[in-house]
Design a protein with these regions (language model features):
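Amphipathic alpha-helical interaction segments
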Residues: 68-72
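Residues immediately within or flanking Cys/His clusters that coordinate Zn2+
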Residues: 4, 59
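Short Cys/His-rich metal-coordination motifs, predominantly Zn2+-binding knuckles/fingers
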Residues: 8-10, 62-67
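Short, intrinsically disordered terminal segments enriched in charged and Pro/Gly residues
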Residues: 48-52, 75-132
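Acidic, metal/cofactor-coordinating or nucleic-acid-engaging core segments within structured domains
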Residues: 55-57
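Short recognition patches in nucleic-acid-associated and regulatory proteins
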Residues: 6-53, 73-91
Length: 132
């Protein structure tokens, strides 16, 4: 079951082959990183020269249009779009904190969470809830 992952800004394909390709920035340095497209698989391929340590905050952007992928709803998360077999489509929301295993697949019907740091508390990507 192959999903296509796309940039929410330019609709460019982010997984032309096996991995999702994103630009990552941290402490004035940038690199292309490869993420697993499999939900719950948190393995990341990072160049040796681009050192990341647990709890580092990483800024992700589209490698095609360079737009920031930080979520407008939660600055500690990034988001991209996905489309799967049939009409299944939605948003993937994932942590920008290196080593923080938290990913959500959000569709019109449901939210699926993956990772030991993910949980239902406070997760609401439909916009309903308390007013700020």
């Amino acid at each position: 079951m192959k999903r296509d992952y796309t940039c929410p800004w330019c609709d460019g394909i982010l997984n032309p082959n096996v991995k999702i390709i994103l630009k990552a920035e941290r402490a004035g340095r940038a690199a292309l990183v490869l993420l697993s497209p499999q939900p719950g698989n948190f393995q990341v391929i990072v160049p040796e020269s681009f050192k990341l340590h647990r709890k580092d905050e990483v800024r992700f952007s589209c490698p095609l249009c360079a737009r920031d992928l930080t979520s407008k709803r939660d600055a500690t998360k990034a988001q991209i779009h996905f489309a799967g077999p049939g009409a299944q489509s939605g948003v993937v929301v994932f942590s920008r904190i290196f080593g923080h295993h938290e990913t959500y697949f959000v569709t019109n019907q449901e939210v699926r969470s993956y990772g030991e740091n993910a949980g239902p508390a406070g997760v609401n990507y439909w916009g309903a809830g308390p007013k700020e």
